[in-house]
């Protein structure tokens, strides 16, 4: 038996920030804030005062997305996040959902191939694209709501045995 001690190779930091409404500066409670990079994803929720904090965060370059139902999604690519970073996010009022974040949609219906948020996987039929393998380039992030996102032929991962409903 060999005793082994694991050391943290990467340093971690604590970051904090706020989510407020444009024009009023009012805090936005329960806003989702996502820090994403090729190596890490961290999802946070703002508190009743629109504030968030995370300890044990790996510093680096992240895409930052934030949103809340009733506000337009915030997107910032290539943001350097380091120790002591205070990330202040301002959301414009409005109804908008590009599915980069999950705002609580409900999936129902008898089908086994249900809606899910994911990076779209292309399907083809006779060499032609039947379903695209990418999200819309003009919105935040790279995710979309798709049904059974498995790729292959258009009949491999489609909706069978009834409907699947997204509300």
Enumerate the predicted regions with their spans.
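A short, amphipathic beta-strand motif
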Residues: 4, 13-21, 50, 89, ...
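Short, acidic Ser/Thr/Gly-rich low-complexity loop/linker segments typical of extracellular
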Residues: 27-29, 34-56, 78
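Extracellular glycan-recognition surfaces and repeat-rich motifs
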Residues: 98-164
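A short, solvent-exposed beta-strand micro-motif common in secreted/extracellular proteins
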Residues: 58-70
């Amino acid at each position: 038996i060999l005793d082994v001690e694991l050391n943290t190779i990467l340093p971690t930091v604590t970051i904090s920030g706020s989510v407020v409404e444009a024009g009023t500066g009012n805090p936005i409670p329960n806003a989702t804030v996502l820090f994403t990079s090729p190596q890490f994803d961290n999802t946070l929720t703002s508190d009743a005062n629109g504030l968030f904090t995370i300890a044990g965060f790996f510093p680096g370059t992240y895409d930052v997305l934030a949103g809340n139902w009733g506000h337009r999604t915030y997107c910032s690519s290539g943001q350097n996040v380091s120790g002591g970073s205070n990330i202040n996010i301002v959301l414009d009022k409005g109804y908008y959902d590009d599915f980069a974040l999950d705002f609580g949609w409900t999936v129902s219906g008898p089908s086994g191939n249900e809606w899910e948020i994911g990076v779209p996987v292309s399907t083809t039929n006779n060499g032609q694209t039947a379903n695209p393998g990418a999200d819309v380039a003009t919105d935040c992030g790279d995710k979309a709501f798709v049904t059974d996102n498995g790729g292959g032929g258009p009949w491999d991962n489609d909706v069978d045995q009834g409907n699947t409903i997204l509300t």
